[in-house]
Regions:
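Beta-propeller fold detector
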Residues: 46-54, 107-115, 165-179
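Entry beta-strands of beta-propeller and related beta-repeat scaffolds
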Residues: 15-20, 73-78, 135-140
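Beta-propeller blade signature
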Residues: 32-44, 90-106, 153-170
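Short glycine/acidic-enriched loop and turn motifs that connect beta-strands
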Residues: 24-29, 82-88, 145-150
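Eukaryote-skewed repeat-based solenoidal scaffolds used as protein-protein interaction platforms
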Residues: 60-70, 75-77, 82, 87-95, ...
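Long, internal scaffold/assembly segments composed of regular secondary structure
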Residues: 125-171, 176-178
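Blade-loop segments of beta-propeller domains
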Residues: 1-24, 51-57
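Repeated scaffold domains used in trafficking and secretory/extracellular systems
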Residues: 3-13, 58-68, 116-134, 180
Length: 180
């Protein structure tokens, strides 16, 4: 049965299965649980879960997808959300990322606030992809968006709505490049 009323996604990891659920938060409460990541054995016995509250989210998984990847004992949950209303009263949509320690199921890092492309923020992000390299040292994320051609220091960050972000698995964004 569903843990929360909105299904986000499924991931079959090396040793465990993961399901992600969510619920709407139209009251914009920072204390309301909006995402729950649930860890199961391969025979579907529940092991543990990670509850994520508020995170600037009114509607989790809105107008996009959810994908997961594991590397170095961490589970990366990459998805999207409709955010709290801005100063003009508009609820914009963007990507969001959660990093969870697989053994404790505790949240170790997150990205959900309005930011910029150098931090990996993409709005609007309609399709999210995430993959670790073979060493597990780098995490790559790709978003399908409606973005135009943006440049920073003469380098393209997003072209024709495709944005590629490279992260060190143990840190923040190290570089942004685009491949079409």
């Amino acid at each position: 049965s569903k843990e929360l009323n909105v299904f986000g996604g499924f991931y079959s990891g090396k040793d465990y299965n993961y399901l992600v659920f969510g619920q709407n938060n139209t009251a914009e409460s920072d204390s309301k649980e909006v995402v729950r990541v649930v860890k199961y054995t391969k025979s579907w016995s529940k092991v543990n879960s990670c509850s994520i509250s508020g995170v600037n989210t009114t509607k989790p998984f809105s107008a996009g997808s959810l994908r997961m990847e594991e590397a170095g004992g961490k589970l990366y949950v990459y998805t999207c959300h409709e955010m709290y209303a801005d100063s003009d009263g508009i609820n914009h949509q963007a990507n969001m990322l959660f990093t969870i320690d697989e053994s404790s199921m505790s949240l170790t890092d997150s990205m959900y606030d309005v930011s910029n492309l150098t931090d990996g923020y993409v709005s609007h992000s309609f399709n999210q992809f995430i993959k670790a390299d073979e060493s597990g040292k780098y995490i790559y994320r790709v978003d399908h968006s409606e973005s135009s051609n943006y440049t920073m220091n003469g380098s393209y960050l997003s072209v024709n709505g495709i944005t590629l972000t490279k992260y060190k698995a143990d840190g923040k964004s190290t570089a942004v490049s685009v491949s079409i």
